[in-house]
């Protein structure tokens, strides 16, 4: 199962967002399908909480109208990027509410949810509750100035807004009022031993995730799971369910979305129990993809919720209504994609929206850039100069030129894939290189090393270009047998390289498949489908689903068929104007030196 962090539905998403949750998860999922594994890739829009209400006020919409608006925008953009979700849904469905409440009740029955009187942050100007993440100040532990009210991204410690030094609202900069209020808490202290033991076994995670988990084990204290709001999942307890201004905290219901989306997917496929193969089968593997600001929720809180439901916390308890659910196997967290050294920010105007980018450059250029030059292990600055260089040199000159030269010459001289005659050592050496790359590239992808995987695939492309330049088939008119052997070798390696690059470049991979005479679906794309809510039929919304079982791409070198008709190619990737690297498009923010 590929569980992808849920984009927040308070506005369109920018390329910094999809560099963390979007492209890496799809590259991984496409590879796993090609390798013959059953994959369930799920996510959706996160639609509850104060930020939705605040943005709705700004736009003069109701909270539901705003959620509907950006749910559609985000769904359309992720479809355009080619993210192959088995289900991309939303958190305002009847199915999600039911699943969240059932897991809440299981945790409550097992004693992992407790009431506490606490201090809540209120905006003096609006009277509205401020979510912890919307309060910023100085961390009392490490002194970091940009700590949030829920955690410090610098030291990884969990915080309470009232603990911050000089706390201010991130919405309008005012100092919040702190008032007493009663809330429900997830008793994380009741998972100190069980969760700590589990985290100690996660030695293979990325270093940035392991850094945070070390602090998590030392800071296991109760964490609020309710808020004074009227927009969210109702609390299914006597004395709470009828309170109009008490709802489950957005972070609590959002992480449960991975499971509720799996249940919804199963219901929509006509087999309501299909989710069990990914959640209760001990052999199933769960991979979670996100940006680094979500590590705590996935490495500490979500495992604790699952343990509490399963009766596996320090207090024990009964197994919940869904059976014993699997804990995460891998948490794949990316760092931040920045611009001019700063995080992408809508409020500061440092933002490149996915929709704008796709309209001008198409999906595969962005997918490739994020894969080979994105923030896999450290914060990475996006520059137009680097983007133009990668597109022009690697995609257009290297990969596009290899496809064009190989297919054009074979189509012109033979009209079809020529038969190899008397292959030489150089031919076999190149074919061996491309065959062996499947194990190397696949190994990197299995370990979520996307940069290394893309670079290794491009090494095959570079070797094939050198081979063509060395063999000079355009000079072999008087030796057609040798020319055909060279062109057959080149076409075979183009076919292999196209397979190796398919997880990164699924749209152009389909085109190369067809240029090589292939028919049918090589690399399937997600479909936007209009559906009715399974539990509230009068509500309709868009989802992403797809028929990925129909695609032909498989993770192996397949011998190219002699005599297969070839088609005259058109450029795979258009070269970009070098001046674009200096200024970027007119609609893009100006880079600061």
From Swiss-Prot:
What Enzyme Commission number(s) appear in the record? 6.1.1.10
**InterPro entries, A to Z:** Anticodon_Met, Met-tRNA_ligase_1, Met-tRNA_synth, Methionyl/Leucyl_tRNA_Synth, MetRS_core, MetRS_Zn, Rossmann-like_a/b/a_fold, tRNAsynth_Ia_anticodon-bd
The molecular function terms in GO held by this entry are:
ATP binding; metal ion binding; methionine-tRNA ligase activity
Q: Where is this motif: 'HIGH' region?
A: 7-17
One of the record's GO cellular component terms: cytosol
GO BP: methionyl-tRNA aminoacylation
What stretch of residues is annotated with the motif 'KMSKS' region?
343-347
Q: Which cofactors go with this protein?
A: Zn(2+)
Give the UniProt subcellular location, in the record's own words.
Cytoplasm
List the catalytic activities from the record: tRNA(Met) + L-methionine + ATP = L-methionyl-tRNA(Met) + AMP + diphosphate
Q: Name one Pfam family in it.
A: tRNA-synt_1g
Alphabetically list the UniProt keywords.
Aminoacyl-tRNA synthetase, ATP-binding, Cytoplasm, Ligase, Metal-binding, Nucleotide-binding, Protein biosynthesis, Zinc
Binding-site list for ATP: 346
Its chief place of residence is cytoplasm
Cofactor binding annotation: Binds 1 zinc ion per subunit.
Q: Does the keyword Electron transport apply?
A: no
Record's keyword annotation contains Metal-binding: yes
Q: Which residues of this UniProt protein bind Zn(2+)?
A: 139, 142, 152, 155
Q: Which family does it belong to?
A: Belongs to the class-I aminoacyl-tRNA synthetase family. MetG type 1 subfamily.
Assembly and partners are described as: Monomer.
The free-text function statement in the UniProt record for this protein reads: Is required not only for elongation of protein synthesis but also for the initiation of all mRNA translation through initiator tRNA(fMet) aminoacylation.
Record protein name field: Methionine--tRNA ligase
Q: What organism is this sequence from? A: Saccharopolyspora erythraea (strain ATCC 11635 / DSM 40517 / JCM 4748 / NBRC 13426 / NCIMB 8594 / NRRL 2338)
Q: What is the lineage of its organism?
A: Bacteria, Bacillati, Actinomycetota, Actinomycetes, Pseudonocardiales
State the encoding gene: metG
């Amino acid at each position: 199962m590929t569980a992808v962090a849920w984009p927040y539905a308070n506005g369109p998403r920018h390329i910094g967002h999809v560099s963390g949750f979007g492209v890496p998860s799809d590259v991984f999922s496409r590879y796993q399908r090609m390798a013959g594994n059953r994959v369930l890739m799920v996510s959706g829009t996160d639609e509850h909480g104060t930020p939705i209400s605040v943005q709705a006020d700004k736009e003069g919409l109701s909270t539901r109208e705003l959620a509907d608006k950006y749910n559609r925008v985000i769904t359309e953009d992720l479809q355009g990027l080619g993210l192959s979700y088995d289900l991309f849904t939303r958190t305002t469905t009847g199915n999600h509410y039911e699943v969240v409440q059932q897991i809440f009740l299981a945790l409550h029955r097992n004693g992992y949810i407790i009431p506490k009187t606490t201090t809540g942050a209120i905006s003096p100007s609006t009277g509205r509750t401020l979510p912890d993440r919307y309060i910023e100040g100085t961390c009392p532990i490490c002194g970091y100035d940009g700590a949030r009210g829920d955690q410090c991204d610098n030291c990884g410690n969990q915080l309470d807004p009232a603990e911050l030094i000089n706390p201010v609202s991130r919405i309008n900069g005012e100092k919040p009022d702190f008032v007493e209020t009663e809330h429900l808490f997830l008793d994380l202290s009741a998972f100190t031993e069980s969760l700590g033991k589990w985290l100690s076994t996660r030695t293979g995670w990325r270093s940035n995730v392991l850094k945070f988990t070390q602090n998590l084990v030392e800071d296991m204290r109760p964490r609020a799971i309710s808020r004074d709001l009227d927009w969210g999942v109702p609390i299914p307890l006597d004395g709470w369910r009828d309170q109009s201004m008490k709802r489950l905290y957005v972070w609590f219901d959002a992480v449960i979305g991975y499971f509720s989306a799996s249940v919804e997917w199963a219901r929509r496929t006509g087999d309501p129990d299909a989710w069990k193969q990914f959640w209760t089968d001990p052999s199933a593997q769960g991979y979670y993809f996100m940006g680094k600001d979500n590590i705590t929720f996935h490495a500490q809180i979500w495992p604790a919720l699952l343990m509490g439901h399963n009766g596996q916390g320090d207090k024990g308890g009964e197994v919940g209504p869904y059976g014993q659910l699997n804990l995460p196997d891998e948490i794949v967290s990316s760092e931040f994609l920045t611009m001019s050294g700063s995080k992408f920010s809508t409020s500061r105007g440092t933002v490149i929206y996915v929709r704008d980018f796709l309209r001008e450059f198409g999906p595969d250029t962005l997918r490739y850039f994020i894969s080979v030059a994105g923030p896999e292990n450290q914060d990475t600055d996006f520059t137009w100069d680097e983007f133009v260089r990668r597109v022009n040199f690697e995609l257009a000159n290297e990969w596009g030129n290899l496809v064009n030269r190989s297919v054009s010459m074979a189509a012109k001289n033979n009209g079809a894939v020529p038969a190899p005659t008397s292959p030489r050592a150089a031919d076999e050496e190149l074919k061996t290189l491309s065959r062996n790359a499947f194990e190397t590239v696949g190994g990197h992808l299995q370990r979520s090393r996307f940069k290394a995987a893309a670079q290794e695939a491009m090494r095959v492309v570079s070797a094939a270009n050198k081979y063509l330049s060395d063999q000079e088939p355009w000079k072999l008119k008087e030796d057609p047998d040798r020319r055909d052997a060279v062109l057959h070798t080149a076409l075979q390696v183009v076919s292999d390289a196209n397979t190796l690059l398919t997880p990164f470049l699924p749209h152009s991979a389909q085109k190369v498949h067809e240029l090589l005479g292939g028919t049918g679906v090589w690399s399937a794309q997600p479909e936007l489908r209009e559906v009715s809510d399974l539990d509230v039929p009068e509500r309709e919304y868009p989802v992403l689903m797809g028929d990925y079982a129909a695609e032909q791409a498989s993770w192996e070198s397949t011998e190219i068929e002699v005599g297969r008709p070839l088609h005259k190619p058109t450029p795979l990737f258009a070269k970009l104007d070098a001046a674009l690297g200096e200024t970027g498009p007119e609609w893009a923010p100006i880079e600061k030196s």
